[in-house]
C-alpha cells in the first residue's frame, strides 16, 4: 500500500468570523469611555474593512481593539493589510484595511522552491492560490508543515485537505 499523502497550503479566512470580530469591536468601542463619543464606524466591504473615526489617536485604539478581537476569534493579525490613514470630511480620519486572502505567485514559488531543495522525497505544485504538497511519508509532510510555519510570510497560512 504505497499511497501518497498530501495537504494544501492556503491563505484564507472565515468571513463570518471577521463579521463577528467587527461586531465585537464596535460593541467594545461604544462602551469604552474614551471612544464612546467619537462616532467611530467600522464597515466591512468585499475584501476590505473601512474605519472612520475622530482622530489618529482613536484610530490607533480602534486598530488595537480590532486586532485583539480578531486574535480571540482565532484570526491571524497578518490578515490585516493596513492602508494609509487619510483625512475624511469633518476633520475625521479614515483608513482602509485590506483583508489578505490567497497565496501570491511569488510566495507560492518560495514555498515550492524550499520544499524541492530541503525535502527530496516531497513534491510541491502550485494550484491557483494554493500549494499542494504530497509525499508517501506522513512524517515528511509534518516536517514540511513545520518548515512552512517557520518561514515568515506576510499573510496567514493554513493547512487544509490533509489526506
Curated annotation (Swiss-Prot):
A GO molecular-function annotation: nucleotide binding
Signal peptide start-end: none
Keyword field: Nucleotide-binding
GO cellular component, one term: cytosol
Gene3D superfamilies found in the cross-reference section: 3.30.70.860, YajQ-like, domain 2 (3.30.70.990)
InterPro entries per the UniProt record, alphabetical: DUF520 (IPR007551), UPF0234-like_C (IPR035571), UPF0234_N (IPR035570), YajQ-like_sf (IPR036183)
Pfam families attached to this UniProt entry: DUF520 (PF04461)
Recorded family membership: Belongs to the YajQ family.
PANTHER family (alphabetical): UPF0234 PROTEIN YAJQ (PTHR30476:SF0)
HAMAP family documented for this protein: YajQ
Biological function: Nucleotide-binding protein.
Stated name of the protein: Nucleotide-binding protein SYNPCC7002_A1983
Species in which this protein is naturally found: Picosynechococcus sp. (strain ATCC 27264 / PCC 7002 / PR-6)
Amino acid at each position: 500500500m504505497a499511497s501518497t499523502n498530501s495537504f494544501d497550503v492556503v491563505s484564507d479566512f472565515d468571513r463570518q468570523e471577521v463579521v463577528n470580530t467587527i461586531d465585537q469591536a464596535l460593541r467594545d468601542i461604544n462602551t469604552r469611555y474614551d471612544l464612546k463619543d467619537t462616532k467611530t464606524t467600522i464597515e466591512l466591504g468585499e475584501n476590505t474593512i473601512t474605519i472612520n473615526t475622530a482622530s489618529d489617536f482613536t484610530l490607533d485604539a480602534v486598530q488595537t481593539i480590532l486586532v485583539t478581537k480578531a486574535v480571540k476569534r482565532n484570526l491571524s493579525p497578518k490578515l490585516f493589510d493596513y492602508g494609509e490613514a487619510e483625512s475624511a470630511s469633518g476633520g475625521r480620519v479614515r483608513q482602509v484595511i485590506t483583508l489578505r486572502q490567497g497565496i501570491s505567485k511569488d510566495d507560492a514559488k518560495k514555498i515550492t522552491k524550499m520544499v524541492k531543495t530541503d525535502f527530496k522525497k516531497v513534491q510541491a505544485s502550485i494550484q491557483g492560490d494554493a500549494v499542494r504538497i504530497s509525499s508517501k511519508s506522513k512524517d515528511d509532510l509534518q516536517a514540511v508543515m513545520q518548515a512552512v510555519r517557520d518561514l515568515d510570510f506576510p499573510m496567514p497560512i493554513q493547512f487544509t485537505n490533509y489526506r
